[in-house]
Amino acid sequence: MSEHSRCPVTGRTAGNPVAGGGIANRDWWPNQLHLDMLHQHSSLSNPMEEAFKYKEEFGKLDLKAVKKDLYTLMTDSQEWWPADYGHYGGLFIRMTWHSAGTYRTGDGRGGGGTGNQRFAPLNSWPDNANLDKARRLLWPIKQKYGKKLSWADLMILAGNYALESMGFKTFGFGGGRVDIWEPEEDIYWGKEVEWLDNKRYSGERDLENPLAAVQMGLIYVNPEGPDGKPDPVAAGKDIRETFGRMAMNDEETVALVAGGHTFGKCHGVGDPKLVGPEPEAADIEEQGLGWKSGYGSGKGDETMTSGLEGAWTPDPIHWDMGYLGMLFKYEWELTKSPAGAWQWKPTDVAEEDLAPAAHDPSKRVPTMMTTADLAMRMDPIYGPISRRYYEHPDQFADAFARAWFKLTHRDMGPKSRYLGTEVPEEDLIWQDPVPAVDHELIGDREIAELKKRLLASGLSIPELVSTAWASASTFRGSDKRGGANGARIRLAPQKDWEVNQPEQLKIVLQKLEEIRQEFNDAQSGGKRVSLADLIVLGGCAGVEEAARKAGTDVTIPFTPGRTDASQEQTDTESFAVLEPLADGFRNYMKKKYSVSAEEMLVDRSQLLTLTAPEMTVLVGGLRVLNVNFGQSPHGVFTTLPETLTNDFFVNLLDMGTEWKPLSKEHDTFEGRDRKTGEPRWTATRVDLIFGSNSRLRAIAEVYGSDNAQEKFVHDFVAAWNKVMNLDRFELG
């Protein structure tokens, strides 16, 4: 064998495997618990220095200069990818829409907040065809501003300024989206293994949770109709389900569709079989670009993207009422695009309602509508809304501006996270507003006094700890919703969630409110404590007392400043999606699910931004603190409950215990003395996974060691403090 074919470092030949190749553990054991999602986006994959703070860099940005550069780019048509109608606005709007539009309310994942459209699988979804060109067109802008402007912000900003450059007044823009540097491993996009497959339905047409899109690789619905069948009324049902799961009501949905489709065109000339592979599958010389078409030049008027062909309006680069005007002015006839996709054409169209050819303004061509577009007229709910918008252009413009702002900011959390000079002043209900602090905050002396009152109140350690956990653990790192700030645990719908044990919660909250009122009334100055702060402080006091009982004195850091939201500031329907279907930290399962309890624990831990060690120490600590749902004994592996010991780990790892399932589903278990057969403990899958899974057992062994008690307490306190403050963005 030639020495030229041998690696000078490893000695391997060209045909040999390399590091990282071969069969992975998950190939051998596909049901293995997926813990890697807890350790994403570390400094090991991030090229930015540790001290880098995007908020500070964005603050140095001149948005007016960025806007000017983007305006220039919009009409600077490039030969390698010419602009339709001489304006890239439609392309950038689609890029922005598809970046933000992956958001779903079920778990808060997706959306445009991380710049994830740059990575697989999104960069290669069929619905994102040729958006690689949009991002490549933006590279000179990104290159110019570098670390001051993230890709995530730029992809949203480009769509906003595209709208403005074509005559539309947007609602505003908030920056602050921080880029990720690797694909997200936590987002479930579906079980399908082929593009555009739809094995996500059960029953008549029940879409699997938490998914929102109807097919693998689509952002929303199939524009040709459900399963490619051109039925506008049936399409309306799909649209309502999908947009609803993306946090949009019927009026917002119509505004988004009608407003967004006022601009740009679809591309569907030539044979789809002539389109090359997506970016992730393209050859190396394509340099990250995909979908190279062999039809003619493959660009301009010979572009192939969705397979649909044509513009929606006679003037696709200006804001007007053209979309709704065409929708209601004409009857529509089913036809097929040159690429063979179902679409609709207007009958007896007038000359003035023809659109210019995208790359030859001397030619006039018919407009089109998709099956999904016709749902805006034919659906019994969407139809009247569309008609009202058509008859009231100002109302339509305002609705689209607000819906577009919601689309592009829904995953960013509260308004306090928005950056820049274009943030609108108005508070919006979907931003989960909380009041500003309007009083002097308590200090160390008052904090110590309140802890004494809380511990002397008659409330138990489990009551104090479980209430604080219930309040804070609603937080989702995905869309930055939930958390203890606002004290919404006392409001609908949270006060009535089964997992929060409403009867017990009511008693605890009444006692906490008494303490709060008595304390505030006794203050001669302006100091006050909010119920939100007191709930968290009560949990901290309970943890500290439990640690003291175990022989370790600790003080949990406490920073006041939370405020109490009102019911009027709380959208009950919107908050309903935050209800835990399972909370392994409290050993709670609402019902039996197709996924295991331990998988749901890892999922919730990821939403809480916890690492595997943090998840492990929290479960072990909360078990001995006796905060299980319904005070269940499962996993309470201690004879000293309400004492913060490492007993959970010591007894879990005790080989003197033999475990047997109590149910045929293997979801509850009994541990008996291996010699005598005497019962010792009961447990759930969430408890036993820390002894069964090799990675979690390795962590459990750290905390189960004879000299681990102090480390266990301090690690528990650190993880507890993290959860209590997840929504305190102002502290970051």
UniProtKB/Swiss-Prot annotation:
Residue positions binding heme b: 261
Required co-factors: heme b
Entry EC no(s): 1.11.1.21
Cofactor: record remark: Binds 1 heme b (iron(II)-protoporphyrin IX) group per dimer.
GO BP: any one term: cellular response to hydrogen peroxide
Top-level taxon: Bacteria
Modified how: Formation of the three residue Trp-Tyr-Met cross-link is important for the catalase, but not the peroxidase activity of the enzyme.
Residues of the site described as Transition state stabilizer: 94
SUPFAM superfamilies: Heme-dependent peroxidases (SSF48113)
Active site feature: 98
GO molecular function terms attached to this record: catalase activity; heme binding; metal ion binding
Cross-link (Tryptophyl-tyrosyl-methioninium (Trp-Tyr) (with M-246)): 97-220
Xref: PANTHER family: CATALASE-PEROXIDASE, HYDROPEROXIDASE I, BIFUNCTIONAL CATALASE-PEROXIDASE
Self-association and partners: Homodimer or homotetramer.
Family recorded in the similarity comment: Belongs to the peroxidase family. Peroxidase/catalase subfamily.
Full protein name: Catalase-peroxidase
Encoding gene per record: katG
